[in-house]
Amino acid sequence: MTSPSSDEDIIDIRVIKEEPESEPDSEAEPATTTNSTDSEDSVEQENKKLLETEKNRKREQKHKMLPNGTTSGTSDTGNQVPATSSAASSVDYTAMNAQDYLPTYSNTTLNYQPYQYQTAANGLLNYNNYSQYATANQLGSNYISPANFMQGGGISPLGFTTGTTGATTAAASVATSSASAVIGRSNGRSSSTVAASPADRSYSGVSGGQGQELTIQEFETVTEKIRRHGTYGQSKPPYSYISLITMAIQKSNSRQLTLSEIYNWIMDLFPYYQNNQQRWQNSIRHSLSFNDCFVKVARSPDKPGKGSFWTLHEHCGNMFENGCYLRRQKRFKVKEREPSRKKRNANSQQLHQQQHIPKMEIKEEDPTSITTTSSLGAYSLIPQISTKKEIKEELKAVQDATAAAANLGLIDPSGTPSAVNHSQPTSVISSVGTLGTTQAQMTLNGQYASPYLYSSDFATILPQSQNFLNNTLYNTTSSYPGIDYTNGVYQNTLYSSTNPNSAANL
């Protein structure tokens, strides 16, 4: 066996060693020797050629796993193996980019039509004149007609179909939803889960309790159910608490019921109220107390028992139209009611305070009469006393003042006033007078007989300001020596162009 002559032989040897053992023994390298003699057998030559061919085949398979390039070498038998290249091989070992992996399609194969984008030249941006649209969109045109503007069956929920057929369909849908609402309430389901019709609106009672305003057809269905089964069922009835109380009172023989009888009537006809009794019974009591249409009647001697009767006010009339208790026509309100006990007590106390307030005498000046005594109430002069404590304090102060006056002798202890008159006469101005012509003279220790300090004119005594300024402060006749800046003592002290030496003094 010859030694390898190149790197390719080394690679081939390694590949052969890594092959599994299950390969036939013919793949292994035969231990043959090359002899140049002519005595070799023809069979051995054929076997050698077969092995050579098999080795070349396996070498080509291994080249697929190696990098691109050209390899050359000698075989184990010493024969020169021709160099293999990517160009000569049947497999292309050249590197491929991303474009090579993309599949190629042709328009003729898949029948793809090229898309032509809209441009300003092919009509997308070519707008017609406004006059053409104005002519087309006149009255009666398809563009401006409401029937064509809002079409049913579209994505928008606002779309609907107009015309006779559309109106019939809408009416049928309303009737269907209304019937489904009745069925939902009859089966005990919540009304919120059923599609409510336009006629099925919520109604809230005045004193609490949720009710619903049903249509006439729905009300007839509810009434028929009560008449057929005797009760409404386990579902909540669509009546307010005021409606329930009114029905109970009107269905009774005496037109008056006690509170417990109202409870029992409601629970017998509507089994829904057999549960959670405390809550709705409180609402019933509030409705009876805070609505003027219900009147409380005391028990008569021939009807002993506990609790008063409740009946309807005689002037409330028929609050529910045509016997429909789903909604009242109007709320009944008594115009004038008797004042409550608190108001009556407050009024009596206020009247009692006004009676105990003492009267006061006020003197007024009048040209015809000297004095006039008038008695005024507490609302005109004295502020209203609001509490009993203030009344007691004022009474105590009056008693103390009376006792003090009695001690001083101003008031007789027997209770009659003393004869001492402390009143002063009232002065009345009857006319307007004038002052006297003579005036009193001021005497200051006899030195001055006149109230004036100077009897003569002050203008002649005061100094003249013009003469004072001219003669005293400013003398016009004297001359003041002037300062000669040219020939004086301070000549050439400032910088001058004629004396350059003075520049150093700056």
Swiss-Prot record:
Please state where this protein is localized: Nucleus
- What CDD domains has UniProt attached to this entry? FH_FOXA
Q: Would you say which domain of life the source belongs to?
A: Eukaryota
Report the Pfam families cross-referenced here: Forkhead
Q: Return the Polar residues bias intervals.
A: 79-88, 346-356
Instruction: List the PANTHER family.
Output: FORKHEAD BOX PROTEIN, PROTEIN FORK HEAD
Chief localisation class = nucleus
DNA-binding region as annotated in the record: 236-330
What does gene deletion cause?
A: Worms are unable to form the pharyngeal primordium with the pharyngeal precursor cells, ABaraapapaa and ABaraapppaa showing arrested development prior to terminal cell division. Some mutants exhibit malformed rectal tissues and fail to undergo proper embryonic elongation. RNAi-mediated knockdown at the L1 larval stage reduces survival.
Q: Where is the composition biased (Acidic residues)?
A: 1-10
Lineage of the source organism? Eukaryota, Metazoa, Ecdysozoa, Nematoda, Chromadorea
Tissue and organ distribution = Strongly expressed in the embryonic pharynx, particularly pharyngeal primordium precursor cells. Expression less strong in the embryonic gut. Expressed in adult intestine.
Residue span of the signal peptide, if any? none
Q: Source species, please?
A: Caenorhabditis elegans
Q: Which SMART domains does the protein's record reference?
A: FH
Which InterPro entries is this protein grouped with? Answer: Fork_head_dom, FOX_domain-containing, TF_fork_head_CS_1, TF_fork_head_CS_2, WH-like_DNA-bd_sf, WH_DNA-bd_sf
Q: What is this protein called?
A: Defective pharyngeal development protein 4
